């Protein structure tokens, strides 16, 4: 187990950070074609792990499958994301989640992830590198459009993901923010 932990980047992240530093750290990017994404990233020259097949059983005994790989390294101290592909297409997955009542409406109303905010020393340089590496269209000078959500790069010393911003329908939640460890969750 120790050897496997040493080899897998996400396990190394957890071993290095936890339990002292609960933080938003490395984002996941979902792919519908992980093999093509893997090949494209390898061609850019970054170090990628092998693609690993994973699975677990949900509480009802159904097998949930996925494929995953990590991108080693960073841009000016900001670690790269990891890439994940679920073992079923979105429509099938959503149908299964609804049948299991896991895709039920949230009791507080509609909540949608809108932004992942990264605090970095040089926002434009990091944005430009991630745009070149990941292919997302630019959003202003310091952001990327990530399929309807946004990566926002703000100037600061943390060099990590620091905040998740959610759009909410419930007026009582608007303007609220809370912290879990070193991560901020904000509702707009």
Question: Where are the regions a protein language model picked out?
Answer:
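Vicinal oxygen chelate
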Residues: 2-108, 112-122, 139, 143-188
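Internal, well-ordered alpha-helical scaffold/interface segments
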Residues: 82, 111-114, 128
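Amphipathic alpha-helical segments
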Residues: 37-44, 122-137
């Amino acid at each position: 187990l120790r050897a496997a932990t040493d080899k897998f980047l996400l396990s190394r992240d957890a071993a290095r950070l936890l339990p002292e530093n609960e933080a938003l750290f490395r984002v996941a990017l979902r792919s519908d074609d992980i093999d093509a994404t893997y090949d494209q990233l390898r061609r850019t020259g970054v170090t990628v792990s092998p693609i690993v097949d994973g699975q677990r059983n949900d509480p009802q005994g159904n097998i949930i499958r996925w494929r995953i790989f990590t991108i080693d390294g960073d841009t000016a101290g900001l670690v790269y994301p990891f890439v994940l592909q679920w073992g079923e297409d979105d429509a099938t997955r959503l149908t299964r989640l609804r049948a299991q009542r896991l895709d039920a409406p949230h009791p507080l109303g509609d909540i949608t992830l809108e932004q992942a905010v990264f605090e970095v020393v040089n926002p434009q340089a990091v944005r430009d590198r991630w745009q070149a590496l990941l292919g997302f269209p630019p959003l202003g000078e310091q952001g990327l459009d990530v399929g309807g959500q946004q990566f926002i790069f703000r100037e600061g010393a943390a060099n990590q993901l620091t905040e998740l911003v959610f759009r909410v329908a419930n007026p009582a939640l608007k303007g609220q923010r809370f912290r879990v460890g070193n991560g901020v969750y904000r509702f707009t």
